[in-house]
Amino acid sequence: VDTDAVLDLLRQTAIDVITPRFRALAEGEVFTKTHPGDLVTVADRESEEVITTALRRAYPDAMILGEEAASADPSLMRAFAAAEHSFTIDPIDGTYNFVHGKADHAVMVAELRSGEVVRSWIWQPEHQLAFVAEKGAGAYRNGERLPVLEPAADSTAWRGISSQAQIRDGSFEGLSPMTETWFCAGVDYSHLAAGDVDVIVFAHAKPWDHAPGMLLISEVGGVLQAGDGSTYNPAAPRPWLVGAASPTVAEGVRARMAGALVA
């Protein structure tokens, strides 16, 4: 299936399943998973089902890892780690935003071969923004190729964001204070790939949240590293991630935050 066809699948799923429920969720259509802020809706579940069915039809031998399926069956993570060919699906990234009527949500898919992300798609239905990347072929926003990022040399000029209050409230020598993310990895990574921010610090590392953005930023010169400096591995995710506009930015941030980026 060509890259445009997968993007069309995400767009159509949003039209059919996601957007009709935006700011229109009925009572009984929102559920709590692990804690009060960890939400899932009927739109998440139906969206994942539609995308999973389509990908399985196109790629019958591929392992499909959807967020909601993995939540229901944790053994799927082991199958994903062992798979030669796989896809991740985040049916609504930023569900909390979606439930609360905020436009910053996305539907995301990544394709992996032998554990390496080779294609990724991020569709933001309310913003009508598509971010697509292919390994070695660049990253694109609504069909236009994004330029290689050129972050400032001065670390105090790096624009950083984090979803974690302890990082935003922390004082790190040589770094300016970080501000809030958009609380949607698909939107966060898109802003990094577009050069709007230089670094993102995440606490959680689920593959469906980070595999799409990892390829997107790497195709414009960025990197996604674990807190210990190793390259992010979707099959064996560790807590704390630093997504940065360049290896230099990632290394600089990790060095200055070393004590904070521990599990």
Language-model regions: role of each:
Residues 18-21, 44, 55, 95, ...:
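Residue-level signal for inorganic ion chemistry
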Residues 80-140:
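DPxDG-like acidic metal-binding loop motif
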Residues 58, 112-116, 126, 135-138, ...:
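Short loop segments at secondary-structure junctions
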Residues 118, 146-148, 232:
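Short, isolated positions in well-ordered beta-strands
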Residues 45, 68, 91-94, 125, ...:
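Generic detector of well-ordered alpha-helical packing
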Residues 1-92:
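N-terminal subdomain of lithium-sensitive/metallo-dependent phosphomonoesterases centered on the IMPase/IPPase/PAP
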Residues 150-263:
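An extended, acidic
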